Amino acid sequence: MSYNQSRPDRSETQYRRTGRSTGNQQQQQQHRSSSAAGYGKGAGAPGSAPAPSTYPDNSSLSSNRSFKKPGNAQGGGQPRVNLPPVNHPNNHNNGPNAHSRSQVTGEPGVGGPTNPTESFNRNTGPIPKAPTSQSTVMSSKINETPNTAKVAASGDASQAFPLQFGSLGPDLMVPARTTSAPPNMDDQKRAQMQQSSLRTASNVPASVPKKDSSNKGADNQLMRKEGHNPSSEKADIQVPHIAPPSQTQKSPITNIRMPSVQTPYQHTQVPHPVHFGGPNMHMQTPVTATSFQMPMPMALSMGNTPQIPPQVFYQGHPPHPMHHQGMMHQAQGHGFATPMGAQIHPQLGHVGVGLSPQYPQQQGGKYGGARKTTPVKITHPDTHEELRLDRRGDPYSEGDSTALKPHSNPPPRSQPVSSFAPRPVNLVQPSYNSNTMIYPPVSVPLNNGPMSSAQAPRYHYPVIDGSQRVQLINQPAHTAPQLIRPAAPAHLSSDSTSSVKARNAQNVMSSALPVNAKVSVKPAGVSEKLGSPKDRSHGEVNISLSQKNVEACSLSSSQQPKPSFVSGVPNSSAPPAKSPVETVPLAKSSVETVPPVKSSVETAPVTTTEIRRAEMVSESISVEDQTCKVEPPHNLTENRGQTMPDSLVSDPETATVAAKENLSLPATNGFRKQLLKVSTTSDAPTSDSVDTSIDKSTEGSSHASSEISGSSPQEKDLKCDNRTASDKLDERSVISDAKHETLSGVLEKAQNEVDGATDVCPVSEKLAVTDDTSSDLPHSTHVLSSTVPLGHSETHKSAVETNTRRNTSTKGKKKIKEILQKADAAGTTSDLYMAYKGPEEKKESSNVVHDVSNQNLLPAIPQAVEAIVDTEPVKNEPEDWEDAADVSTPKLETADNSVNAKRGSSDEVSDNCINTEKKYSRDFLLKFADLCTALPEGFDVSPDIANALIVAYMGASHHEHDSYPTPGKVMDRQASGARLDRRPSNVAGDDRWTKNQGSLPAGYGGNVGFRPGQGGNSGVLRNPRMQGPIISRPMQPVGPMGGMGRNTPDLERWQRGSNFQQKGLFPSPHTPMQVMHKAERKYQVGTIADEEQAKQRQLKSILNKLTPQNFEKLFEQVKSVNIDNAVTLSGVISQIFDKALMEPTFCEMYADFCFHLSGALPDFNENGEKITFKRLLLNKCQEEFERGEKEEEEASRVAEEGQVEQTEEEREEKRLQVRRRMLGNIRLIGELYKKRMLTEKIMHACIQKLLGYNQDPHEENIEALCKLMSTIGVMIDHNKAKFQMDGYFEKMKMLSCKQELSSRVRFMLINAIDLRKNKWQERMKVEGPKKIEEVHRDAAQERQTQANRLSRGPSMNSSGRRGHMEFSSPRGGGGMLSPPAAQMGSYHGPPQGRGFSNQDIRFDDRPSYEPRMVPMPQRSVCEEPITLGPQGGLGQGMSIRRPAVASNTYQSDATQAGGGDSRRPAGGLNGFGSHRPASPVTHGRSSPQERGTAYVHREFASLSRASDLSPEVSSARQVLQGPSATVNSPRENALSEEQLENLSLSAIKEYYSARDENEIGMCMKDMNSPAYHPTMISLWVTDSFERKDKERDLLAKLLVNLVKSADNALNEVQLVKGFESVLKTLEDAVNDAPKAAEFLGRIFGKSVTEKVVTLTEIGRLIQEGGEEPGSLIEFGLGGDVLGSVLEMIKTEAGEETLVEIRRSSGLRIENFKPHAPNRSKILEKFT
């Protein structure tokens, strides 16, 4: 058959079965085969698509079928593919469709013979598409035997076998082109095996179609006839490419059947994006099943849900990325309730398209999974202690320091994603597409053991802050966690003699270090000949010291405060009377050393790096100190009854640094500088050499040290304590037991304010040389014990920061990771800004130890020298870690003379020691305020101690608030990455994203340790900090990642401390006040020697602050300046001119300022010439005027020779500046003339210069002329100057017609001409700046005006609005057809019906904006030119004043027909308020000032024009004003027009409230302006249009009573004149108040009824009213007014009175009727 053959010729008969389907499998096969055919077709010709069907067979409709609509996204438009014809031979045995054939066709021989003739006759119908339901009615033609089919296949192609649809599936359809390839039996078997599980036997046989190889276009009609198909379920198969339905071209490429492969829907194996439809497609209605012609895995929650097992999704599978815009989940488009439970099905049932992908691609985030690392074990050969190198320092880690760290940015793993909520979390789908969704895992409980690395470790631990004890935990990384109580007090000894580079693997820490701990600080170098090494005891602490910055001085033990502390714990190891010292040789160091000096808590300064390295405390015995150990006594350990599991050691790297620094010291006379090491061992056995040296001294500690140091005066100052060491030890032991909690809390709170770099060493320890009695020990120095507080010792920082590890960089810089760790440990409100810069270098730690005195000093040392501990610490370590960089170094360092010990005599050194004895750190002493209540005598208390104390206590309360002790649980807390969490992307610190600030209780669900890969939450902390132990349990994710609740502790941490000193970007609390660094040459405000220049500066500063509000105050300041000469006066005038020219808006204010100055400043006489302010002002005006002309010529002149040629842009800019300055000057001149500061002659001269005698003046001059005329025209336009003014305006009129001028200039000329015609009443009068209260008031008026105008919209066009809303909203009823956009399926989700929680916000909350007809003012054609400019709204009233006579911005609503709209507040007349603030507003209405100002000045101008046009008005004016009255008579009154207007408005408002007519009469007398009465009446009547009927009735009664009053406050002429003014502006008033004509007629009717005005006069006013005479009648307004008058008379007086008044007036109603098409309904009642 031909391709272009007509459709009837290519079609075949279609039989339709109306029964319901018997199974889903057949339909799935049909869809599968049709899709496969379409795939082969669409691959070659994607644009081919059939035309819509024109043969809908409605007789076969079923109840469960829905009509197919074009573009249906659910199946109507999507499956429009080119299907092969049913008689194609390939369909019998192609791929998996062989099963469909056997299923549908039935057994051979069942049916009867075929009728070829009938088949030929039925060939006129179109070949239908594949049926989607099975039929229960069988045709007689379906019983075709295979033999008959073969015979038919070999016959003519036109005799196609008739098919009955409903029994055949798309598997039997033949493609457009036939092929001779034999069927592939392997494909059939394979497909049969694949689909055997989903296939059910068919009970209905079907006929075998006859082959027709020539029917190539039959597949184009497969889908046209079927208009509606039942919905079906399809198995998960590979979705082919679907051709868009909008393309109709048929592809000539042969369709090739492709085998359908069952593929899970969730996997990303879709070769092509799924097309749900093209343009103008409609979604299926949700009440019926849909027709799917495309193999899409859909699970419709309806009655025909198939029995197909759902896909199972495992939580641990990798993410499945897929295109989520085009995917549809089950039951989409159906507005059924969504079963959102605690555990949501993985497929997220009933969620629309585009909301969220079913299994979106997860970001490469971190789930807290720990990295498996193989620790390198290093075992010491002597102690066999294991040393691990794979741990990281954590300042807050009290658990295992060798916790496994995850890799940076690992790829997504297939292991189960451990979530972190203690209970299931209800996931609520947001209104937008979230790009991350993690579904709940299986409920398989985890074991109670430690978490393996395959799972995400959770860190549910509280932040260990100030008052909470730090527990000693010593456990391997992979053992079960257990609680380790705080250990017993241990003997803490320090030894820095080792240079072994090793790291301690297991750090332990106690929340309260041993009370009676012994800290021994020994010299870094020990002479080999002074003793042999001894084993160290079990509980010593090694503290490394550096010779750098060490200067030793002797100090008696009695000179120190009694309590001494180690790490915030009372140091109970007081020295005995004799403190023998054991000499310990140096191990692994070549430094020449001195014997160790024994002291209870003596320390020496070390560098920042060394101290921080020394903070590392380990349970294993230090490797580097095995050769030199001191055997301590065990009595201190027995006080607590407990011993620490292992000894506490220091970082060996510190000793190496110390050794290296000692090697670098210069030699002096063969001797090296000697490093002292302070030891706290009290009863350690000593060597003989030490005893020998001690024998030469006295045995009493106080006496000995006093004798050696020679500092007995200072000994008395500090109240020495001569008790024995044992007593002190016992006492301090008791103190420690009693106040363990207190000291632990207080000192650990204070530890954050102490810098780790100052832990061991004070600032200056000086090597004091005193006597020559011990000269037999030239190479050794003996130091007697002294009880020096060691609050800043090395272990102090270790009490809270156990695992802090720092670099040994000589530059003193911190690595960024160490800074971040410090940020985590510093507290909750650390400054983010400080996280980007390292702390400052410690000034004290960088000092280099210099040679002592001279070269002959060391060999001559005869006595033991005691190491003085200067209690001034190097630096405070505040709780906020970044504040270490902000603590001022000069504030904490010692006196300058303490450094002078590097050279000089021994007396100088002793003096320095004396000066440093009292140099205690203020912050250091405040830490022990609870115990050390008394300061030493002579202690210099600085004022900032109190501030530091307050900060310390606030920090303590902060820690108490944030601490969550949970005894009995393992606190294996990791270092927090809170600082890094605020930065959205930082690869360098990715491992900190998985660390948590604390644990999470149930209810917060916890997004602990999860980072959604290089993104996340920026600006807030991710992890709420709360308590909770680590418990292995099923963990849940938190819904959308990266968010934080409002009232979480994270926000509290940022908000806490907001009252502290601000630093950087964020507040940093708990920081001492930073000392200001004073510059050598500080900035000072420059002083002026010249007195005249000082005056000018003072005057300029005053003028800069000049505003209308502070005018009087600043004027007094100017008068206070001594202006006593012409130079000063000229300077004042020049500055006033400069300000006025640059700010033309304030010209009136500056002119007023000059007017006041002229009267206040005296005259001067210089050189016999009288100098006045006016004279200088006039000269300045002339100078500026001429200067403008010169500058304009220079700007327009081409550059001469020798001058730099200016570009056109530069010349234009200069021209603009000159023009702006000239305009300001002209305006100022005019304002000065208005103040009578200049003469009229000068004004005429200026006008003549601006007009020029030539015919073409510059546009700038014309603009200046128009500005000057608008300013002073009303004053110079009088009878004497009439001839001159006429000449000016004749020339201006001529210039306005010249086309050479710009349109802007021509309009300005026209406006000036109109202004003179209107008697100089400006439409937009500019009178200078407003006060701030006026600006606020006008802004409120404008807002109210706009709101009132918008509020009239619904009443005027509500019906159209409702129709629009019904059409555009999906909420319309069933009969309302929504627009195509509402039904079309899109990638944003299908339209949903009205149901619970599935409302589409895209249509409901959208504001409806529609065009609204705004009536335009009707203007008659007149001679006057049209003036363009802002006529109201926001164009006026914001920065200028606009006084007017009457307003026509009537704010009436269309709903006022029934008595007015009482809900709308009254609008204002203009932008001016009342001068009587006590006047109330009636009925809660707003003042008239709140009305719009659209046509205020137009009305005023119209009123003035009408005055000239009406002879009656002119005669009335002459009667009122007399023959000598002129136009300027109102200006001659005592009150200005603006004041009269304000008084009249305030009076009428007060009358509405109080209803006191006498008050109105008194106000009119106070006004004393009878000529203003018509204007006042016009204002009152116009204002009443915005008020209620009751107030209008009161106004009508008031007008009648005023006319009838005895004092004749008003007369009939004034009343008529006022009514005439209202009628002149009635056309504009109706625009804002549609019923203004009716309201005015009622007032007129009241006046006629009371016989104040006759009806004849009212009729005349109506006929002559309007902008043009007769315009009111022409537009129908006159008829409305007259009809309202007659209606009012009828209501008030009755029908008889109305007839009598009409007869007597002689008015003809026909004369007031408007011409067609206008009409007056009110007037028609009386015709």
From Swiss-Prot:
Ranges for region Disordered: 1-154, 172-252, 360-423, 552-581, 678-736, 784-815, 977-1007, 1188-1212, 1336-1375, 1446-1492
GO molecular function: mRNA binding; translation initiation factor activity
Domain MIF4G: from-to ranges: 1096-1319
Composition-biased stretches (Low complexity): 25-38, 79-97, 699-712
Record flagged with keyword Transit peptide: no
Superkingdom in the source lineage: Eukaryota
BP terms from Gene Ontology: regulation of translation; response to virus
Bias type Acidic residues, positions: 1202-1211
Regions of compositional bias (Polar residues) in chain numbering: 55-65, 114-124, 131-148, 191-205, 552-562, 678-692, 800-810, 1342-1360, 1446-1455
Keyword Chloroplast recorded: no
Keywords: Initiation factor, Phosphoprotein, Protein biosynthesis, Translation regulation
Region (EIF4E-binding): 916-928
Disruption phenotype: Displays resistance to potyvirus (C1YVV) infection.
Extent of Basic and acidic residues compositional bias: 222-236, 379-395, 714-736, 979-994, 1188-1200
Spans through the membrane: none
A Pfam family annotated for this UniProt entry: MIF4G
Domain MI: 1539-1663
PTM sites of type Phosphoserine: S985, S1529
Assembly and oligomerization: EIF4F is a multi-subunit complex, the composition of which varies with external and internal environmental conditions. It is composed of at least EIF4A, EIF4E and EIF4G. In higher plants two isoforms of EIF4F have been identified, named isoform EIF4F and isoform EIF(iso)4F. Isoform EIF4F has subunits p220 and p26, whereas isoform EIF(iso)4F has subunits p82 and p28.
Function: Component of the protein complex eIF4F, which is involved in the recognition of the mRNA cap, ATP-dependent unwinding of 5'-terminal secondary structure and recruitment of mRNA to the ribosome. Plays a role in the accumulation of some potyvirus during viral infection. Required for the accumulation of cucumber mosaic virus 3a protein and turnip crinkle virus p28 replication protein during viral infection. These proteins are necessary for cell-to-cell movement of the virus.
Family: Belongs to the eukaryotic initiation factor 4G family.
Protein name as annotated: Eukaryotic translation initiation factor 4G
Source organism of the structure: Arabidopsis thaliana (Mouse-ear cress)
Gene name as annotated: EIF4G
